[in-house]
């Protein structure tokens, strides 16, 4: 049996390199199309590809040609509309445009080039240039991790990693190679013995000698060991360094009665986008979900996004719970701590100063980055202004933005998590 081992990096995708080069070349067109797709899509529908349309004029290749030298005077008969230097508009209908024009008998043009990008490519462009700000490498034990990966087959290794199939295949090949000539002689001797028994049954001397030769050849073949140390093959596993920083993201969502269903939907969409971003870009990050009204509760992902529980509004309950969880499970000396909070800004008046106090004294000194989005078309209330004071005290690690409609989610998200240049 023949085995074909395909060691190409791209496998069957022979055009992968060309496709990547094409995506780099038209990156601006694709980014613009992705941003438009994000603005019109549901956040739940973000993990699909997208059709990209590039104007035909933008895919023209540059051409080297002779310039128009000298002075030329040309008379174009019948021209009453244009003067020198004006651009002639593309003819309608018969010009090869992409619109719903009527048929025409003149004009020519070029249709837009349309192609499909995959889910992976869509998400790559969607989250390009985004990151968790101030992610630092902690120097604690266990921060540097390694992942074990397959690295082929080795002739030496741990007995527990022996590759039985490769070992038996190697042993079989060795036996065939070393006993090939003996097996050929054995077949000839067996044929000779059959001929002697049929044609010369009385020639006992030759028959006996042939039988002795057959026994000798069989003994030679059987002396070859079934398995030799040379045949042993082992799965080779190597450790690849997987440098990573331990990070945790706290997601705090207001589900009080003042939050309308539309407002809650925008908040959920913002957190779904954040969750998708975190899971795609960071291997080692934990997410803590906290819902709050008059009281706060840590919940799982399913309950965070789909529970219908509601109540009054005391924002400080969520901040207190976050501080307790930080102290209990995520000490700042071990973890990079992030938080994202979404609310409509409605809060019990006496509670807003408490929120500022908890943030300023118990949370902000320990977090890498804290974001607050207020979902309201109305004027800001006390909570927003208290948080502005936090932003003044922590300009590098605190950010707040306002959301009015679902169309603001992606631009605000990019503003909050835009990659900062190192200073």
From Swiss-Prot:
Protein name as annotated: UPF0229 protein PSEEN0423
Family (UniProt): Belongs to the UPF0229 family.
Pfam families, sorted: DUF444
Entries under HAMAP family matching the protein: UPF0229 (MF_01232)
Highest taxon, organism lineage: Bacteria
InterPro entries (UniProt xref): UPF0229, vWFA_dom_sf
Ranges where the record places region Disordered: 85-107
Biased composition range(s): Gly residues: 92-107
């Amino acid at each position: 049996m023949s085995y074909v081992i395909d060691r190409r990096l791209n496998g069957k995708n022979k055009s992968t390199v060309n496709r990547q080069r094409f995506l780099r070349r038209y990156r601006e067109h694709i980014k613009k199309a992705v941003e438009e797709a994000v603005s019109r899509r549901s956040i739940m529908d973000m993990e699909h590809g997208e059709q990209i349309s590039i104007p035909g004029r933008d895919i023209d290749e540059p051409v080297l040609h002779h310039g128009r030298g000298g002075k030329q005077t040309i008379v174009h008969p019948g021209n009453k509309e244009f003067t020198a230097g004006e651009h002639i508009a593309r003819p309608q209908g018969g010009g090869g445009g992409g619109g719903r024009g009527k048929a025409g008998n003149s004009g020519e043009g070029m249709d837009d080039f349309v192609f499909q990008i995959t889910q992976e490519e869509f998400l790559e462009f969607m989250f390009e240039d985004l990151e968790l700000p101030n992610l630092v490498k902690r120097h604690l034990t266990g921060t540097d991790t390694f992942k074990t990966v397959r690295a082929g087959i080795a002739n030496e290794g741990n007995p527990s990693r022996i590759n039985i199939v490769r070992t038996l295949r190697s042993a079989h090949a060795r036996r065939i190679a070393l006993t090939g000539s003996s097996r050929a002689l054995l077949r000839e001797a067996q044929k000779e013995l059959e001929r002697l028994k049929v044609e010369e049954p009385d020639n006992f001397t030759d028959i006996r000698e042939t039988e002795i030769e057959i026994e000798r050849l069989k003994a030679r073949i059987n002396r070859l060991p079934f398995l030799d140390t040379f045949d042993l093959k082992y799965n080779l596993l190597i450790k690849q360094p997987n440098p990573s920083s331990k990070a945790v993201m706290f997601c705090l969502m207001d589900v009080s009665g003042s939050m309308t269903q539309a407002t809650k939907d925008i908040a959920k969409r913002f957190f779904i986008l954040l969750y998708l971003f975190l899971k795609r870009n960071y291997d080692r990050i934990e997410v803590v979900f906290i819902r709050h009204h008059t009281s706060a509760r840590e919940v799982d992902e399913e309950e965070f996004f789909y529970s219908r529980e509601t109540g009054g509004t005391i924002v400080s309950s969520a901040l207190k719970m976050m501080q307790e969880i930080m102290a209990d499970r995520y000490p700042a000396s071990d973890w990079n701590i992030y938080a994202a909070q979404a609310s409509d800004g409605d809060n019990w008046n006496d509670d807003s100063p408490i929120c500022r106090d908890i943030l300023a004294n118990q949370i902000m000194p320990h977090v890498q980055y804290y974001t607050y989005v207020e979902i309201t078309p109305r004027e800001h209330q006390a909570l927003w202004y208290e948080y502005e004071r936090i932003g003044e005290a922590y300009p590098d690690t605190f950010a707040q933005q306002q959301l009015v409609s679902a169309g603001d989610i992606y631009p605000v998200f990019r503003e909050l998590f835009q990659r900062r240049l190192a200073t």
